[in-house]
């Protein structure tokens, strides 16, 4: 089975990577799909985000990382995927994922959704919270990979 794990990953957190590692255990092939939205650019380019994830998942042979734009169901179809993986942290995530599930099913009934609960230590972790912590001089260790932490500090210093 081919699965897609889509997201902005701006930047990728250890919570994101935890979901990817767990999902890779029950998929033949997992594609981490980095959403590239030119209308809403992130702090890091799609290419940078793809590279950060690739550096973090080198030990997972059945996982690849690609960027995409447009509708995620179209990308999933193009990749031959029949399953979308999403991580759930708190209740608000469930509501958002349910909305997306209903719309994606309307667009393509052949693509299913699998939600994985975040591990407890990552339930309140988000990429925007990480950026705020680093901007305010806080310690991001244990929240993002070291190579991402270095890149984030450098990027924020130049903004």
Curated annotation (Swiss-Prot):
UniProt superkingdom: Bacteria
Instruction: Name one cellular component (GO) term.
Output: cytoplasm
Assigned keywords, A-Z: ATP-binding, Coenzyme A biosynthesis, Cytoplasm, Magnesium, Nucleotide-binding, Nucleotidyltransferase, Transferase
Its quaternary organisation is: Homohexamer.
Q: Which residues bind ATP?
A: 16, 87-89, 97, 122-128
Cofactor(s) listed in the protein's UniProt record: Mg(2+)
Q: What is its EC number?
A: 2.7.7.3
Q: Where is it mainly found?
A: cytoplasm
Single GO biological process annotation from the record? coenzyme A biosynthetic process
Indicate the family of this protein.
Belongs to the bacterial CoaD family.
What organism is the protein native to? Answer: Dehalococcoides mccartyi (strain ATCC BAA-2100 / JCM 16839 / KCTC 5957 / BAV1)
Question: What pathway does this protein act in?
Answer: Cofactor biosynthesis; coenzyme A biosynthesis; CoA from (R)-pantothenate: step 4/5
Q: Name one GO molecular function term.
A: pantetheine-phosphate adenylyltransferase activity
Protein's name in the database: Phosphopantetheine adenylyltransferase
Gene behind this chain? Answer: coaD
Compartments reported by the entry: Cytoplasm
Tell me if Ligase is a UniProt keyword of this record.
Answer: no
Task: Site Transition state stabilizer: list residues.
Answer: 16
Q: Where, by residue number, does substrate bind?
A: 40, 72, 86
